[in-house]
From Swiss-Prot:
This is Mannonate dehydratase. Its EC number is 4.2.1.8. Its cofactor is Fe(2+); Mn(2+). It comes from Histophilus somni (strain 129Pt). It catalyses: D-mannonate = 2-dehydro-3-deoxy-D-gluconate + H2O. Gene3D superfamilies: Divalent-metal-dependent TIM barrel enzymes. Signal peptide: none annotated. Pathway: Carbohydrate metabolism; pentose and glucuronate interconversion. GO terms for molecular function: ferrous iron binding; manganese ion binding; mannonate dehydratase activity. Coiled coil: none annotated. Belongs to the mannonate dehydratase family. InterPro entries: Man_deHydtase, Xyl_isomerase-like_sf. Keywords: Iron, Lyase, Manganese. SUPFAM superfamilies: Xylose isomerase-like.
């Protein structure tokens, strides 16, 4: 697999020199300074590409070309935003970039309640605490209708949690959930956040699927024409939250996705941490079934807790994800492609990483400190080497 590293651009505290020293050869990045919906010009794309190439790196994957909320809700100027998206794909292809990761999650890209959860070894991880999240939704945001999604016992537990929170606790939890994490392109106040949620009133799961289907049928033929492989990222966490529909969470969702738009350019970002939160998801089976459509891999593991709806980010080779089985499935697919004349490697990146060692003293992007991901990348490199020697005689 191609070893890649997510980089948030010139303002990322992790430098390109750091990336190169970590052993990555490819960079996963985006033009975060361009507002959502606007066309990425060839000039801006080439400027970023040249910045990477000056350090001996390549731009392997775009993560992400954000999808404007108007497209997801099919309101406002959504057709114009779709046309802009098509032009961005054409421009990327003309610059030699051929994998685009994106997601179709409403409002938030990913959600955690704690960005500094202390692990037994003293490192810090990201965590989703279901009780804390319920307290936020019911008693801080006070989302209309939220009580319908929680049992009386869950509401009582959330109320007890809320009652012991200080003003500082409330502010921190609110900021963690709605301020926008790395990878999210938007940040909201409580009022703005509720207004964004309100845009999805009346949009059921089935209706939301029709919106994604429309987007796919507009975009994927263009991607196919220009040689770009689109790779949708799953929902994180992979279940409905805040009354919002979620439609990329399970193996059945993946099947719907392929059936809806069967062109080869329509594929997946296989994020083991996102899919792995749901106990019913057999990740090895999913990777094997849709191997030919996996164009990018996010490798990380999560650990479900006593409350099965709560989880934290585990060490990369620990937790609930069968990383051995998933990596073997991805390598099997890579060798299959090679036998059929396609020598392109599947880009993978160590997704997230614990804040540890010297990074504990630094200001870092939550989940994206250098040393935790350095460790993850080294572990995946070793796992891949062992699998290749034992199973593939390589």
């Amino acid at each position: 697999m191609e070893q890649t590293w997510r980089w948030y651009g010139p303002n990322d505290p992790v430098s390109l020199d750091d990336v190169r020293q970590a052993g990555a050869t490819g960079v996963v990045t985006a033009l975060h300074h361009i507002p959502n919906g606007q066309v990425w010009s060839v000039e801006e794309i080439n400027k970023r590409k040249a910045l990477l190439e000056e350090k001996g790196l390549v731009w392997s994957v775009v993560e992400s070309v954000p999808i404007h909320e108007d497209i997801k809700t099919q309101t406002g100027n959504y057709q114009q935003w779709i046309d802009n998206y098509k032009q961005t794909l054409r421009n990327l292809a003309s610059c030699g970039i051929d994998i685009v990761c994106y997601n179709f999650m409403p409002v938030l890209d990913w959600t955690r309640t704690d960005l500094e959860y202390e692990m037994p070894d003293g490192s810090k991880a990201l965590r989703f605490d279901q009780v804390a999240f319920a307290a936020f939704e019911l008693y801080i945001l006070k989302r209309p209708g939220a009580e319908e999604t929680y049992s009386p016992e869950e509401q009582a537990e959330a109320k007890a949690y809320f009652d012991q929170m200080s003003e500082a606790d409330i502010a921190k939890l609110t900021k963690n959930i709605i301020a926008g994490l790395p990878g999210s392109e938007e940040g909201y106040t409580l009022e703005e956040f509720q207004a964004q949620l309100d845009r999805y009133k009346g949009i059921s799961t089935e209706k939301f699927r029709t919106h994604l289907a429309y987007f796919l049928n507009e975009i994927v033929p263009v991607a196919q024409e220009v040689g770009i492989r689109m790779a949708i990222h799953p929902d994180d966490p992979p279940r409905p939250i805040l009354g919002l529909p979620r439609i990329v969470s399970t193996i059945d969702d993946m099947q719907w996705f392929v059936d809806t738009q069967p062109l080869a350019a329509n594929g997946f970002t296989f994020c083991t941490g996102s899919y792995g939160v749901l106990a019913e998801n057999d990740l090895v089976k999913m990777a094997e079934k849709f191997a030919d459509r996996i164009y990018f891999a996010h490798l990380r593991s999560t650990q479900r807790e006593e409350n099965p709806r709560s989880f934290h980010e585990a060490d990369h080779l620990a937790g609930d994800v069968n990383m051995f089985g998933v990596t073997k499935a991805l390598l099997t697919e890579e060798y299959r492609r090679k036998a059929n004349g396609d020598n392109r490697l599947i880009p993978m990146r160590p997704d997230h990483g614990h804040q540890m060692l010297d990074d504990l003293k630094k200001k870092t992007n939550p989940g994206y400190s250098a040393i935790g991901r350095l460790r993850g990348l080294a572990e995946f490199r070793g796992l891949e080497l062992a699998l290749k020697k034992v199973y593939f005689n390589d």
